[in-house]
């Protein structure tokens, strides 16, 4: 017999991947801000055990923790556990990103627009992946961020082109001090040949912790992000910064480049080639906070 579910309890399944945790924790935190909840983080079950639970076995699972109003997760390894948890203890099963299982199995699927989700009652389209960043009221016009990614499935790389773009950005406004950081994908030789410049501090990813970037985004009035690092583009937008896109070669027109092109057309970001050198990047007029928008929809739909 299922225990009575409470909207005050959220189970968050984590596969341990930073990008997935950023999304699921972002939604859980947003729910907590709107309506205080207890967030319980759980490891996903092995697939065989999750399937057994779905078929009515594993009756002792999760009996020692409060029943959830919501179970949520991001990443393929969490999908069966979401369904098993709902089967065993109740609650609404919410999956972030397009699942590998049929969409109809979940109460709600939060899927980025660039994944072209179908129009269904249990599908909410998001602008990019959700994240933990909060809109900031402490942005400083004299602080800028340069966020460097690396080669990916959709983009190749060109150090020299990036060096030229970075030099132009630094030279354009002597009132801004820039902080540059890298990612796990950044080629090792990128920093080796990056020219030193006044008003530029370089902090490699190896010298940062999980809270470093959110702290920087809370203060930076401008952020330039390489096109491959689309998740950081959305994080910078959520913080409220004026966002520019550093251009790297695309392997082909793809869903990521199409998503960035759409953001530029809507005035949220500026590509380097479209940036007038004598002007500062403009901040978007609206608020970009997809985690809160989705959390508000969930509460109004099920827990109002």
Region spans (language model):
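Conserved donor-binding/catalytic loop of nucleotide-activated donor transferases
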Residues: 218-220, 238-242
């Amino acid at each position: 017999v299922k225990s009575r579910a409470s909207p005050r309890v959220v189970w968050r399944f984590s596969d341990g991947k930073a990008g997935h945790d950023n999304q699921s924790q972002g939604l859980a935190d947003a729910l907590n801000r709107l309506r205080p909840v207890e967030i319980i983080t759980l490891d996903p079950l092995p697939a065989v055990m999750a399937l057994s639970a779905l078929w009515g076995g594993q009756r002792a699972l999760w009996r020692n923790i409060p029943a959830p109003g919501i179970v949520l997760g991001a990443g393929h390894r969490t999908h069966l556990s979401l369904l098993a948890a709902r089967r065993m203890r109740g609650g609404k099963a919410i999956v972030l990103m397009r699942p590998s299982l049929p969409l109809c199995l979940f109460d709600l699927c939060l899927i980025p627009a660039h994944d072209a989700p179908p129009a269904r009652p249990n599908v909410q389209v998001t602008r990019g992946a959700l994240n933990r960043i909060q809109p900031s009221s402490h942005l400083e016009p004299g602080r800028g961020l340069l966020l460097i990614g690396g080669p990916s499935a959709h983009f190749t790389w060109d150090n020299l082109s990036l060096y030229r773009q970075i030099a132009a950005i630094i030279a354009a406004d002597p009132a801004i001090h820039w902080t540059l950081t890298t990612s796990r994908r950044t080629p090792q030789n990128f920093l080796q040949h990056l020219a030193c410049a006044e008003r530029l501090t370089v902090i490699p990813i190896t010298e940062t912790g999980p809270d470093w970037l959110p702290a920087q985004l809370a203060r930076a009035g401008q952020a330039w992000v390489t096109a491959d690092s689309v998740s950081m583009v959305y994080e910078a937008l959520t913080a409220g910064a004026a966002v520019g896109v550093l251009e790297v070669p695309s392997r082909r027109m793809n869903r990521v480049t199409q998503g960035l092109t759409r953001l530029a057309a809507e005035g949220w970001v500026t590509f380097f080639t479209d940036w007038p050198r004598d002007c500062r990047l403009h901040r978007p007029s609206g608020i970009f906070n997809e985690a809160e928008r989705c959390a508000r929809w969930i509460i109004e739909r099920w827990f109002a």
